[in-house]
Amino acid sequence: MAEKRNIFLIGPMGAGKSTIGKYLSETLHMDLYDSDQEIERRTGADIAWVFDVEGEEGFRKREEQVISDLSELQGIVLATGGGAIKSPLTRNRLSARGIVVYLETPIEKQLARTQRDKRRPLLRTEEPPREVLTRLADEREPLYREIADYVVRTDELTAKQVATQIVELLGL
């Protein structure tokens, strides 16, 4: 790969962005970053705490800054948070600074992958998880598609197979 382009993974919670990102970075010998992990590193607190103390709006501002900073790097794989695309600024930066791959994942798969994960603030509500995920999908799906250079379904493949498919799609 002569020019090291960035690869940005977007999609809902439970899509496998972090795991698929790991395989992509290993295969392509690119550095891997995870925006949620970077927020935790910078704040010294976990995402749930940031949500509790600063609310979703405060978290999104931090996320916007982290993605702005990381997307300026070259030759990286970045796994974004599921709601990162809510910010027009973030959508513009991702589109302008790399290849955006939307990991499309049905609600059923998201439920199966997130049901035991207590670290997801948007699922820690009275609202049933299926309703939360459906509402988020309705809000975010158009935004994912708006900036996606590629759309890859993740429901029938392992994370490693999805990473291989992305490498083939990108011709890398």
UniProtKB/Swiss-Prot annotation:
Catalytic reaction annotation: shikimate + ATP = 3-phosphoshikimate + ADP + H(+)
Q: Which Gene3D superfamilies does the entry mention?
A: P-loop containing nucleotide triphosphate hydrolases (3.40.50.300)
| Statement: the UniProt record of this protein carries the keyword Metal-binding | yes
Give the E.C. number(s). Answer: 2.7.1.71
| Pathway recorded for this protein | Metabolic intermediate biosynthesis; chorismate biosynthesis; chorismate from D-erythrose 4-phosphate and phosphoenolpyruvate: step 5/7
Task: Reply yes or no: does the keyword Metal-binding apply.
Answer: yes
Swiss-Prot/TrEMBL cofactor(s): Mg(2+)
**GO cellular component terms, semicolon-separated:** cytosol
Give residues annotated as binding ATP: G14, A15, G16, K17, S18, T19, R120
Question: What's one GO BP annotation on this UniProt entry?
Answer: chorismate biosynthetic process
Organism superkingdom: Bacteria
Which InterPro entries does UniProt cross-reference here? P-loop_NTPase, Shikimate/glucono_kinase, Shikimate_kinase/TSH1, Shikimate_kinase_CS
Q: Which keywords are on file for this protein?
A: Amino-acid biosynthesis, Aromatic amino acid biosynthesis, ATP-binding, Cytoplasm, Kinase, Magnesium, Metal-binding, Nucleotide-binding, Transferase
Under the heading SUPFAM superfamilies, the entry gives: P-loop containing nucleoside triphosphate hydrolases
- GO MF: ATP binding; magnesium ion binding; shikimate kinase activity
Q: Which residues form a coiled coil?
A: none
The record's subunit annotation is: Monomer.
Function, as annotated: Catalyzes the specific phosphorylation of the 3-hydroxyl group of shikimic acid using ATP as a cosubstrate.
Name of the protein:
Shikimate kinase
Annotated organism of origin? Tolumonas auensis (strain DSM 9187 / NBRC 110442 / TA 4)
Please name the taxonomic classification of the source.
Bacteria, Pseudomonadati, Pseudomonadota, Gammaproteobacteria, Aeromonadales
